[in-house]
Structures are given as C-alpha cells and as structure tokens.
A protein has these predicted regions:
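Flavin-dependent oxidoreductase catalytic cores
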Residues: 1-370
Length: 370
C-alpha cells in the first residue's frame, strides 16, 4: 500500500489517507457567520479526496477575529450558519471534518490580505486587541490591551463554549491554533509575552495559558474525538521561541492527551527571516515526532506527490497538510493517487472523469447508460 494513501486512526476517528486540507482563512463571513462562500469553498474541497478537511481558523469570540469577516463560533447564530454547510458535506462527501479554534490576540482588527492586511484603528471601525502584554505586533501600531485575570477567564470559557458547539455540529476533530503569531503563540513567545505573573517569564510560565486552553477544549469535546494543536516550531527571530521549546511544549501536550501536533513556523514577528524551500518545515515535524513520539502533521511547500509519499514512508511525519497547493489544484489527492498507483474516493457524479489509463483510481466502480 502506498504510504500517503494508507489509513491512520486518531482516537475514534479513522482517516483513509494522510492528506489534510489545511485550515485557510477566507475572510468571507458576516458577523462571524458562514456564508454561501463557505458552502462553495468547503464543498468543493470536501470532494478533493483528502482524508481530513480542516475548517479555517474560527474565532471563539468577536474580539478574537483577525478581520471583520473571520468565521466565528461564539453564539447560536454562528453555530446555526454552519449547519447547512456541514449537512451538505456529509450528504455528498465521506470526508472527516475538523475545525481550528483560534483567537487572534494582538493580530486582531486587521484588514483582509487583499486590502493590505494592516491594523484597522478604532476610529476607522476597528477594535482594541487583547494580548498577553501591551506590546504591538509592529512598531508604531497601537499597543494591545494586556489581558487581566477576568480576560483570561473569559477567553478560556470562550474556547470551551466553542468546543461544545463544534461537538453539537458533529465536527470530527478540533485543532487548537497556537501558531502564526496569534494569541496562544503570543503567550508562548518571549517576543510577545512580557508578563511578570504566572503566565510570563520562564518557558514553563509562558506555556501555562496555552496548556490551560488545550485542557479546557479537551474536557469540553467528546472523549472519542481527537484534539490536536498547531504550533510554530520557531519564530525565525533571535531570542524568540525555538524548536527545543516546541518539543518541551509537545511533551506537555502529550501528557494532557493531545492527539497530534501540526508543525508550522513563524508569524509572531515582522522581523522573521524564513528560508523558503520545498518541505522547509518538515525537519521540525520530524524532530517533534522523534523526540515526543506523537503523531505529527508536516506542512509548507509540500507540493509534489512523490515528495509527500516519501516523507510519510520515511516516518518524518504522519500527515501532510496542504493549503495553497490545494486551492490551485482542488483535486490534488486524485492526481497524487493516479501518480502513485493508489486509489481515492470520488463521488459517483464524477466517476466518468476517471482517466482510461488509471482504471482503478476510483476503486471498484461501474456505470452505464441507455
């Protein structure tokens, strides 16, 4: 069996292959509510043939949105808006669906990327962001408000409430977003966390709130459904969060029942210098997997099927997550299966698209006409 198309079980959820559609912000919600765009976007990705589809970073409270148009899950209206989207996916695709729960922290109140992505001032319709410390993301920006005890409690409760709503929606798995410079990553990184209480200073203290959030989500989500965490393995800035910190964090997550680590990098500082190349973040996933012994997801410029299969076969990671490559080619898993001689699930409406030279691509299928 081809490694990339071999099954893998996380808790009570078995995935048919190792391909994950990464969570990708769409900036297309209204008041946090999913729209027709989400029906189209998630619907066509659900037919991709991937093993797991992860819904974009979903804010647990309005102030935790990156932009005005981020998806949210904080009240009955945001929950209800996702129901028809998920119902359509379940009706037409066998894919498992995860959701990434997130809080933007000091990177909140931003423009959409195609509008420039900059901070929106309160006077221009934005809002004051909250963060571990009153340290802005960029020099010259309005500093965020440092979270006090009441704020920490509010956010902790918001993650728990969102996890319960996700469970009611039938979400198969949750990924807690602790990467890319958003709130939980801000707590982890000494570049953003300047607190002097039990949530700042030492690495142990900086890990405390993210670990509390994980425990809260794990307790609120059904025991038979997995919960993982996305991390930035390094800040790519001297004096920031590094791989050895990520490994220590992963050990603590494993002790608390974490089911996977999705290993990305960067995002907490505009000073980062990232050496981009195919698979440039795979060594981080490999290091975490070998040091901690828990399932890992590799991500970042893994665009070729042979490359993806090779790293799974070598044990460098257990899954590969794809974002931009999947947007460019929403049938990437089909094409990968064809190239590697594997099989992939396709809806019967699309069976006739199976190339003649790949007669077993969609498995044991048959159709006819008068």
């Amino acid at each position: 069996m081809t490694a990339l198309f071999s099954p893998f079980t996380l808790r009570g959820v078995t995935l048919p292959n190792r391909i994950v559609v990464s969570p990708m912000c769409q900036y297309s919600a209204e008041r946090g509510e999913a729209t027709d765009w989400h029906m189209i976007h998630l619907g066509h990705l659900a037919l991709s043939g991937a093993g797991l589809l992860c819904i974009e970073a979903t804010a647990v409270e309005p102030d935790g949105r990156i932009t005005h148009h981020d998806l949210g899950l904080w009240d009955d209206a945001t929950e209800a808006a996702l129901k028809p989207v998920l119902a359509a996916i379940r009706k037409h695709a066998p894919i498992r669906v995860a959701m990434q729960l997130s809080h933007a922290g000091r990177k909140a109140s931003s423009q959409a990327p195609w509008e420039g992505g900059q901070l929106i001032a309160v006077a221009d319709g934005g809002w004051l962001a909250h963060a571990p410390s009153a340290v802005p993301h960029k020099d010259g920006e309005t500093p965020p408000l440092a979270l006090d005890t009441a704020g920490l409690n509010r956010i902790r409760d918001a993650f728990a409430a969102a996890a319960k709503r996700a469970a009611r929606l039938g979400i198969d798995a949750i990924e807690v977003h602790a990467a890319h410079g958003y709130l939980l990553h801000q707590f982890l990184s000494p570049l953003a966390n300047r607190r002097t209480d039990e949530y700042g200073g030492s690495r142990e203290n900086r890990m405390r709130f993210p670990l509390e959030i994980f425990e809260t989500v794990r307790a609120a989500f059904p025991e038979d459904r997995p919960v993982g965490v996305r991390v930035s393995a390094t800040d790519w800035v001297e004096g920031g969060w590094e791989l050895e910190d990520t490994i220590a964090f992963a050990h603590e997550l494993k002790r608390r029942g974490c089911d996977w680590i999705d290993v990305s990098s960067g995002g907490v500082s505009p000073l980062q210098k990232i050496p981009l190349s195919p698979g440039y973040q795979v060594p981080f996933a490999q290091a975490v997997k070998r040091a901690v012994g828990m399932p890992t997801i590799a991500v970042g410029l893994i665009n070729e099927p042979a490359h993806a299969n090779r790293l799974i076969d070598a044990g460098d990671a257990d899954f590969v997550a794809m974002a931009r490559a999947m947007l460019y080619d929403p049938r990437w898993p089909w094409h990968a299966a064809a190239e590697l001689g594997a099989q992939v699930t396709a809806p019967p409406q699309y069976w006739r698209s199976q190339p003649r030279k790949h007669k077993a691509l969609f498995g044991d299928i048959a159709f006819g006409q008068r």
